[in-house]
């Protein structure tokens, strides 16, 4: 159950939301942050998506409306659903006294899902926005690690997540940006209201990023409200 706003402000936020593009450092930051807190859980949006065993639809650049940037079709439905589910899990943890750290891109319909589920709660909202050059280099550097992960997880090269990864490998071979969805996410971040703490972690090591988040958590605090929908 959500406590009163004044009580939440006194106690501090029990939910963190860390968003940004792929390779922005969300997962690494969240895991390190969780270890620095006395009782904390990491709720990863991608893991919510992976709960869909059959019919899973990972978004690709062609799924985005060129005008609004919103995802269309089943990809959009599943994207909004995974963030909704991540926020529901985070709320359950928070109500049990466990700090929850949610990570996902959290733009457009995903941000609306967050508003719907976490409205009236105090959240530490963080946007990680490294430079585009850093994002692209990290995308290339992560390919071997992701290949090993997917090989261990799936025995089917036609699995949607494996197929999406194969597209990024081909992009690297062609000299194109590894994550072509990056531009869509960046435009979505531009449409977010300027709430919480926005940080360019380019050139920072992960521990320093966490130090900064803890030192500046008051700047990240945001009382979630429906009047703050993205532009």
Predicted regions, residues:
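P-loop (Walker A) phosphate-binding loop of NTP-binding proteins
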Residues: 21
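Conserved substrate/cofactor phosphate-moiety recognition/catalytic segment
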Residues: 31-87
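Conserved phosphate-donor/acceptor-positioning beta-strand/loop module used by diverse small-molecule
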Residues: 104, 119-142
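Glycine-rich phosphate-binding loop used to anchor ATP phosphates in small-molecule kinases
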Residues: 77-122
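Hydrophobic anchor at the beta1->P-loop junction of P-loop NTPases
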Residues: 18
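Walker A/P-loop
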Residues: 27
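ATP-binding Walker
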Residues: 24
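Small-molecule kinase domains that catalyze NTP-dependent phosphoryl transfer to phosphate-bearing small molecules
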Residues: 145-209, 225-231
């Amino acid at each position: 159950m959500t406590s009163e706003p004044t009580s939440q402000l006194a106690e501090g936020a029990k939910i963190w939301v860390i968003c940004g593009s792929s390779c922005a450092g969300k997962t690494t930051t969240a895991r390190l942050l969780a270890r620095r807190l006395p009782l904390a859980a990491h709720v990863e949006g991608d893991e919510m998506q992976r709960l869909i065993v059959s019919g899973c639809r990972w978004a690709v650049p062609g799924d985005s409306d060129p005008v609004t940037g919103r995802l269309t079709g089943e990809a959009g439905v599943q994207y909004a659903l995974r963030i909704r589910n991540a926020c529901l899990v985070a709320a359950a943890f928070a109500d049990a006294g466990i700090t929850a750290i949610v990570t996902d891109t959290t733009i457009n319909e995903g941000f609306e899902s967050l508003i719907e589920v976490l409205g009236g709660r105090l959240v530490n909202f963080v946007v990680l926005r490294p430079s585009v050059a850093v994002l692209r280099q990290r995308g290339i550097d992560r390919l071997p690690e992701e290949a090993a992960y997917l090989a261990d997880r799936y025995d089917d090269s036609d699995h949607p997540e494996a197929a999406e990864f194969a597209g990024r490998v081909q992009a690297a071979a062609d000299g194109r940006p590894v994550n072509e969805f990056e531009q869509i996410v960046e435009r979505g971040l531009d449409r977010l209201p300027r709430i919480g703490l926005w940080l360019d972690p380019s050139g920072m090591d992960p521990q320093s990023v966490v130090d900064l988040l803890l030192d500046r958590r008051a700047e990240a605090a945001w009382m979630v409200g429906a009047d703050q929908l993205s532009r």
